[in-house]
């Protein structure tokens, strides 16, 4: 415990020293629904983190990580959130694809992709959902057909992905596609690594209710990727895709909950300022929200490393956060229903939290 306390102090001190100067203006930027904010500056921040050794904490040392324990990763995410540090831009590579390649990739794939992920030199997006395959992910229809043989063989990809976060700025996409014609459901799927900067890829940003456009439609029309950029076995992509989702629901959720507590504390102050706190029904709902947040934290701590438990944690926090958005509108009353052009933070929270139970796997 002493070592963990010292690690927490080190993280806290480093963040205090470095979230200053050119990076001071980034505090609090880039959260859900606001991923477009100060994007280039946040890339530089991520690279600053990488240079100091604060990216890829949980990766094994032999792959460029710190080999940090689960407890240390939890501490880092909590302190990162408490410091108000900006949302990361390299998280798809660092937290999803990187661990997937370490667990299931080839030596060549790890050698090619892990170093630039760690240094935040190549950014990734996740090509899962399609117009006809969202929560029912096994219904994906985007196809990939092998063209040629030997070292020059390539997969030719045709189809559409949607709700693809940050596809408009990513250099690469890890995509779930159907490589066995005539196959259905979980069979016949493969997990491909696809370069985005090529003639066969078109990206169209989707404007959201919040005004942001970090989600995208991605169209593959004869896009190509080398045959050896299949992660896992050809036809075994479902297993790989599910492994990626398990990594997505890891230790970072504890840091996310620090942000939730900050939102709840701010809402309590709004209720106090507006007089809504005098309403016993509002007080009860705020109290229940605080209790729910504590339950969420203890459940997340208890189930770290357990895939099924992590899925339950996702369900718990998604419903809690959506409820917070609804409670914010109740506290604000009529003021929550109107705006003069730009959405308030509370309106943005309410609108974006409607998607919490869907994104990241329903």
For the regions a language model picked out, list residue spans one by one.
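Alpha-helix capping/hinge segments and adjacent helical runs
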Residues: 66, 308-311, 315-362
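A short core secondary-structure module
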Residues: 140, 153-204
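N-terminal glycine-rich flavin-associated loop
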Residues: 88-108, 134
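A short, Trp-centered hydrophobic/proline-enriched beta-strand micro-motif
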Residues: 120-128, 176
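A structural signal for short hydrophobic beta-strand segments in well-ordered beta-sheet cores
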Residues: 142-146
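Glycine-rich beta->alpha junctions and the first turn(s) of the following alpha-helix
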Residues: 201-297, 355-356
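Loop-to-helix element that buttresses phosphate recognition and phosphoryl-transfer chemistry
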Residues: 268-269, 284-305, 318-330
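Amphipathic, small/basic residue-rich leader segments at the start of a protein or domain
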Residues: 1-89, 112, 116-119, 341, ...
């Amino acid at each position: 415990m002493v070592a963990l306390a010292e690690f927490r102090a080190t993280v806290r001190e480093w963040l205090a020293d470095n979230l200053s100067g050119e990076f001071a203006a980034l505090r609090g930027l880039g959260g859900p629904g606001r991923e477009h904010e100060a994007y280039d500056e946040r890339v530089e921040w991520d690279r600053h983190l990488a240079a100091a050794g604060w990216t890829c904490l949980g990766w094994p040392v032999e792959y460029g990580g710190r080999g940090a324990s689960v407890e240390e990763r939890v501490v880092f995410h909590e302190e990162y959130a408490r410091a108000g540090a900006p949302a990361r831009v390299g998280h798809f590579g660092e937290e999803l694809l990187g661990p997937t390649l370490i667990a299931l990739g080839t030596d060549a794939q790890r050698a090619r992709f892990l170093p630039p992920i760690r240094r935040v030199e190549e950014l990734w997006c996740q090509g899962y959902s399609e117009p006809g395959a969202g929560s029912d992910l096994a219904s994906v229809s985007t196809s990939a057909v092998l063209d040629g043989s030997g070292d020059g063989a390539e997969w030719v990809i045709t189809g559409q992905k949607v709700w693809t976060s940050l596809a408009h700025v990513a250099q690469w996409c890890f995509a779930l596609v159907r490589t066995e014609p005539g196959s259905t459901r979980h069979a016949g799927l493969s997990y491909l690594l696809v370069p985005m900067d090529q003639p066969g890829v078109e990206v169209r940003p989707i404007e959201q209710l919040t005004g942001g456009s970090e989600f995208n439609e991605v169209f593959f029309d004869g896009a190509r990727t080398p045959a050896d950029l299949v992660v896992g076995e050809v036809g075994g992509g479902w297993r790989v895709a599910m492994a990626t989702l398990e990594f997505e629901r890891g230790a970072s959720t504890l840091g996310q909950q620090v942000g939730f507590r900050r939102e709840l504390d701010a809402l309590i102050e709004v209720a106090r300022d507006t007089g809504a706190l005098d309403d016993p029904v509002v007080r009860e709902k705020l109290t229940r929200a605080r209790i729910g947040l504590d339950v969420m934290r203890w459940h997340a701590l208890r189930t770290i490393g357990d895939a099924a438990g992590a899925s339950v944690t996702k369900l718990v926090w998604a419903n809690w956060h959506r409820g917070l958005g609804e409670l914010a509108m109740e506290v604000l009353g009529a003021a929550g229903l109107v705006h003069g052009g730009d959405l308030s933070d509370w309106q943005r929270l309410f609108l974006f939290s409607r998607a919490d139970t869907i994104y990241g796997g329903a």
